[in-house]
Amino acid sequence: MFQDNPLLAQLKQQLHSQTPRAEGVVKGTEKGFGFLEVDAQKSYFIPPPQMKKVMHGDRIVAVIHSEKDRESAEPETLVEPFLTRFVGKVQKKDDRLAIVPDHPLLKDAIPCRAARGVEHDFKQGDWAVAEMRRHPLKGDRGFYAELTQFITFSDDHFVPWWVTLARHNLEKEAPDGVATEMLDEGLTRRDLTALDFVTIDSASTEDMDDALYVESTADGKLLLTVAIADPTAWIAEGSKLDKAAKVRAFTNYLPGFNIPMLPRELSDDLCSLRANEVRPVLACQMTLAADGTIEDNIEFFAATIESKAKLAYDDVSDWLEGRGSWQPGSDAIAQQITLLKDVCQRRSEWRQTHALVFKDRPDYRFVLGEKGEVLDIVAEPRRIANRIVEESMIAANICAARVLRDKLGFGVYNVHTGFDPANTEQLAALLKTHDVHVDPTEVLTLEGFCKLRRELDAQPTGFLDSRIRRFQSFAEISTEPGPHFGLGLEAYATWTSPIRKYGDMINHRLLKAIIKGETIARPQDDATVQMAERRRLNRMAERDVADWLYARFLNDKAGTDTRFAAEILDISRGGMRVRLVDNGAVAFIPAPFLHAVRDELVCSQENGTVQIKGEVVYKVTDVIDVTIAEVRMETRSIIARPAV
């Protein structure tokens, strides 16, 4: 009698439209209940029975109920699920499979089955890739997933690498394919095989892509020739190898091993500038004035060289610092090293004065055993030999940026615009409270940005620098020339690592067109989009593997009195993140470990400080002593506490 009643339908419609609703993201907790976070200020409680319908991270619309001054959310519709494709560990009980996602806030096993075509017989503890197939808010009875790929067994020592690469959907090995012969590019190559070119790299490096040679002139100038490996002499644009390199975009450097962008035969042999082997190169010659200025007579050309020595950073640095027993193999090599030191000093002084120089941070190197176990983590400071190579490469990239801009008007540029214009008023206000005065419009210019950076670098601590980092914009890859504020340069285009960066291969092809006097099309934007995405994924993969290895390395220190010096990275309501100075591991110190009485403790992200009873006790960039309280292997998180 009521089923077709239009009044009843209208009433239902009215009730539905009058019921308050909110859209937000579900935040799970360890305790079974959750919250619907609508924005930074507003969140609603989700009771445990309702949490069974959703997953941490789901974006949903929920009905808001009010009872006795307490509001709660009842999930109604799914806007965007948190899990689509994910990795996890398989559970097997009575031939029934389930998978626990590898995520700190997802603890529940999701029933699953192997997808069609997946041959592997899954066992307890196996790692797998899965895809969600059912969700309670889509009208399904429960969550359900399909296993689409077997990753590895639970006892595989290399789980951190294989699981991380699968999580980010990245390649596990070098690309297939061989390059049999060099292309006929119609280039005339200068024979520079008689010159004393040298390479300087880590002792273990096989993919050497840059060699250097310097001469001094009668009037006190330096002629620097930078010779770069020439993979585009072997790889034709649009070929199978080229397409594979375009997809990978970069060589993926993970702790312990790398996954190259090009087949190893090319990256580690045919293109690698090995000592005493004749190799084709793309070269740039520049003249450096006494003050380090790069003069206007920049020249790019194709050549063949024969590196006369494979030098290692530490050997060269030791020799220049008068330490250790290593000696250059000949007087000619010794002279090259001495001249290169001069190049480095001139360019470094020029950049200090006219551009910006990054503060030196050590690189952390994992020393691994046969079974992927972490034997040691070594902090490798950036020494004089590292700086020689860095200054030479930056100079060469400045040359390419100028030539591409002036001759073509495009290229693959690294662009960084400093601060987001929307943030400069806030920035100026923050700096003013610390007696640093900037004009919000001036700081948007390259000159204004450099002026501020120099002022911040002169501060006694890095505290203020860390406070303004959130106002900065990100570096981008663009086909349009533009300034790089971070380096303090008008334009910057890399071409010195074509074995490991696809963008550098593109710039090689553009520079070759200029050398030959040919016209060439502007690179497609899809290439730069892919590069930016791959750079992001590779960085996340490197961080994930490192987190896993740090947890393994520090596991036996948990609960001991071993002290570590740690720099405070940032402060949030829940506590502080710190980086251990000796090995680079990042740990979290929960707020209760800082002070037992919560009401007397204020952790302020805004100010970058921790106050106890109104007094600042800790601030970002402080270095404090900590001990390791706990290592949670399943989430690869390290919990520390201030050492007493």
Swiss-Prot record:
SUPFAM superfamilies registered for this protein in UniProt: Nucleic acid-binding proteins (SSF50249)
- The UniProt record lists the EC number as 3.1.13.1
What's this protein's function? Involved in mRNA degradation. Hydrolyzes single-stranded polyribonucleotides processively in the 3' to 5' direction.
Q: Where, subcellularly, is it found?
A: Cytoplasm
- Protein name, per record: Exoribonuclease 2
Q: Which GO terms describe its biological process?
A: mRNA catabolic process
Q: Where is the S1 motif domain?
A: 561-643
Q: Does the keyword Methyltransferase apply?
A: no
Q: Kindly give the PANTHER family that the UniProt entry links to this protein.
A: EXORIBONUCLEASE 2, RIBONUCLEASE
Could you tell me which NCBIfam families the record lists for this protein? 3_prime_RNase, PRK05054.1, RNase_B
Q: What class of enzyme is it?
A: hydrolase
Zinc: is it a keyword of this entry? no
Residues annotated as domain RNB? 189-516
- Provide the reaction this enzyme catalyses: Exonucleolytic cleavage in the 3'- to 5'-direction to yield nucleoside 5'-phosphates
Q: Name one GO cellular component term.
A: cytosol
Recite the UniProt keywords alphabetically: Cytoplasm, Exonuclease, Hydrolase, Nuclease, RNA-binding
Entry similarity comment? Belongs to the RNR ribonuclease family. RNase II subfamily.
The Gene Ontology terms for molecular function here are: exoribonuclease II activity; RNA binding
Species classification: Bacteria, Pseudomonadati, Pseudomonadota, Gammaproteobacteria, Enterobacterales
Species source reads Klebsiella pneumoniae (strain 342)
